[in-house]
């Protein structure tokens, strides 16, 4: 499999996005209804409120999947390998628009064929430092012909891999990957999982 411990690629300039202290996330009740907003910086702690996010898996023109290694400065799960990118929609922002915006900011990618594949994915996970993620997190796939230009504050490293190779690596060493990727790999057919995407999916990880 592609070496997932390779030397980090040089980061390139990326579009400016508001600092997390100014970024608002959408708060949700247990039924998934929007109940308000809060600064992103205030909702990721030891008692994280349920909020709306998204994950995206990006394929290139050869069918390879982009995996990224989270920057060491990230609050939660620094330095672990994960799916192509994640993010949070702004209040009233359509999710596909948020996916494209985040791809441009974090990786310098222009996306096409943005499609939901796990629209009801939900999880709660706690990292080694006690930081909790608690999200309803629709999962998307997309395609790109762009060359990644990773933002250094977001991405330490990246690699293009065959989906089957990633599936094998996640199952062999789940501790090396983000918990949401480990859970998604159990559900996504291209990673060897299986799920009816119309069914609400939930998982708790500590």
Curated annotation (Swiss-Prot):
Q: Which InterPro entries match?
A: Idi_bact (IPR056375), IsopentenylPP_isomerase_typ1 (IPR011876), NUDIX_hydrolase-like_dom_sf (IPR015797), NUDIX_hydrolase_dom (IPR000086)
| Localization (cell) | Cytoplasm
Q: Where are the transmembrane segments?
A: none
Q: Which residues catalyse the reaction?
A: 86, 135
Q: Which gene encodes it?
A: idi
**What is a biological process (GO) this protein takes part in?**
isoprenoid biosynthetic process
What molecular function does GO assign, one term? isopentenyl-diphosphate delta-isomerase activity
- Name assigned to this protein: Isopentenyl-diphosphate Delta-isomerase
Q: How is the cofactor bound?
A: Binds 1 Mg(2+) ion per subunit. The magnesium ion binds only when substrate is bound.
Locate the residues binding Mg(2+).
86, 106
Q: Where is the Nudix hydrolase domain?
A: 49-183
Q: Which UniProt keywords apply?
A: Cytoplasm, Isomerase, Isoprene biosynthesis, Magnesium, Manganese, Metal-binding
């Amino acid at each position: 499999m592609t070496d997932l411990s390779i030397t980090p690629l040089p980061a390139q300039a990326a579009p400016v996005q508001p600092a997390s202290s100014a970024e608002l996330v959408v708060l949700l009740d247990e039924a998934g209804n929007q109940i308000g907003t809060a600064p992103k910086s205030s909702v990721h702690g030891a008692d994280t409120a349920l909020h709306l996010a998204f994950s995206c898996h990006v394929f290139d023109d050869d069918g390879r999947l982009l995996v990224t290694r989270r920057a060491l400065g990230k609050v939660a799960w620094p330095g672990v390998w994960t799916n192509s990118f994640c993010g949070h929609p702004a209040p009233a922002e359509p999710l596909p628009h948020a996916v494209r915006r985040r791809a441009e900011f974090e990786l310098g990618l222009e996306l096409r064929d943005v499609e939901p594949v796990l629209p009801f994915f939900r999880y709660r996970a706690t990292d080694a430092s006690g930081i909790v993620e608690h999200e309803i997190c629709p999962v998307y796939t997309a395609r790109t012909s762009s060359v990644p230009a990773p933002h250094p504050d977001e991405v330490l490293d990246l690699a293009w891999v065959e989906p089957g190779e990633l599936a094998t690596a996640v199952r062999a060493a789940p501790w090396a990957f983000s918990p949401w990727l480990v859970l998604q790999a159990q559900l996504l057919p291209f990673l060897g999982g299986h799920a009816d995407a119309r069914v609400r999916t939930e998982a708790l990880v500590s």
